[in-house]
Amino acid sequence: MLYFEKKEKEILDVLDKYQRNMVTLDELKAFQKEVQREILASGLEVDPDDNYNFLRYEKYWILLDSIVREKVAKEKIKAHVYAIKANDFMERVAFSNEDTTGPLGKIDKPLLYFDNNTYIYLKKYVPLERITKKYQFVYSPAHLEEMANSIRREDFKYNESIERDLRYLGNLTNNVEFLPNLQKGIVVKSESPYNPLRRVIENFDGTVLSEEMEQDFMENRSRIKAELSLKVKGSTIEGVLSSTAAKKALSSFDWYPEYEQEAEKRLFWEKHKNSYSFLFTDLACIDRIVDTLDNNPEPARKYRSHMHDTTHLIYATQSDIFVTNDGRLYDKATEIFRFLGIPGKVVDYKEFLPEMTNA
């Protein structure tokens, strides 16, 4: 192991122990002084093969110094480490055929949005030449967030499968993407998947914060349900948003009286479907109400996948067809689409697979 490769590992190890309260702040300070003394005393020159490790080591050294000076709180260390690794990943990886973005032409066929499980199945078992041309497949940043999460699990190490995944996604959708827009809610754009992946990785600290908030919610669903005295019968979520308990929870939203007064829910949806705040705040809250009232909730340990499912559901509201390979997400999307009068069709991938492919 090269010298600065070793030092980088030592810093990461001691920071991990500090976060887990296995090392005190005084011991962290002593570690810093010892490393500093060792490097100054050695007068080492950086080996060319060790150059990248040295550059990363410097970033971790600055982080260590900020922690020792108590400028970075213990609970924020993980986000800072991820940010350094993500930045290094983006600097070192030179994607081939990166920018395949082109102008978006007129789309004259139904928009088909798919969750990540469906995408995994398609790229594994269905060659692109077998994909039907009857539908316009559309991806979203949520697909790249899930890909970035896999990259993080591999500690930001690059491998060629990332290239293959991006290439398949771009070709499957012809680079057609749903993107959030403050003025229009969600818009359809043409963009190579490489670009949103870069954005997601470069802003990974925001993803970590979102995951922490999602984990907190899922771990406290039962308490919230008890405190608000929300009770529903049944083992499924079908019709749950029309229950007395749901009405009690929904009554805190400014838009709910308008919803109640509108007999034709489709008209309510048409009025709000282009509102960024309704889509990314209120719709996410409706999703949480469904989860809170669910008598068979998803385990709290699955908070990451749950967060991505919510985001997929939000983007799916803009499609004509939403294909999912997740039974729980299918039930939830079906209930929310029914409740809001969303005209899109929610389908199970197994039933819809013949429609998506050419025999």
Set out the residue ranges of the language-model regions:
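Conserved residues at the C-terminal ends of beta-strands
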Residues: 325
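Charged, low-complexity interaction regions
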Residues: 17-27, 43-50, 72-79
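Short terminal alpha-helical segments
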Residues: 1-22
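Active-site-proximal, substrate-binding regions of enzyme catalytic domains
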Residues: 40-47, 52-63, 80-318, 328-359
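Short, charged, amphipathic alpha-helical segments
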Residues: 25-33, 51, 58
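Generic structural signal for hydrophobic core residues of well-folded globular domains
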Residues: 15-18, 67, 71, 151, ...
